[in-house]
Regions:
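C-terminal "post-core" interaction segments
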Residues: 1-124
Length: 124
């Protein structure tokens, strides 16, 4: 999974869950670390509103991700010069890793099951 410092909120939570469940390799840069939320906010007399975070993510290890982000397994920085040159080092590294993993763990071939006949059959 590609991650970087511009990812926050769901962009923090999804990589955290991906890592927690050991689903694959995180490639890129540490995520932003913004994973608190706001539920319900009062409307002021002038029609404006005020918000304050009142939802956070906790696990058995305690408070997670907020202000820390999710670190990648393989850190790859993407510089403006790379983008200008038409390169994406993070994507290139992720593809390289995925191809290596496919060699080590080739996908299983799956046989499509026969579909059951559910239509009424003529009597013989």
């Amino acid at each position: 999974m590609l991650i970087d410092e511009t990812a926050g909120s769901g962009g923090d939570m999804l990589p955290w869950m991906f890592d927690k469940l050991e689903m694959g390799t995180l490639v890129g840069r540490r995520t932003w670390g913004g994973l608190v939320g706001v539920l319900g906010f009062p409307t002021l007399m002038d029609g404006g509103s005020v918000t304050a975070p009142n939802v956070a993510i906790w696990t058995e290890e305690g408070f997670i991700v907020e202000n820390a982000g999710v670190p990648p397994h393989v850190e790859v920085e993407q510089m403006p010069a790379d983008v200008i040159a038409g390169r994406d080092p993070q994507l290139e590294k992720a593809i390289e890793i995925a191809l290596e993993q496919l060699k080590e763990n080739p996908p299983h071939e799956h046989k499509k099951p026969d579909f059951p006949i559910r239509a009424r059959q003529p009597k013989k």
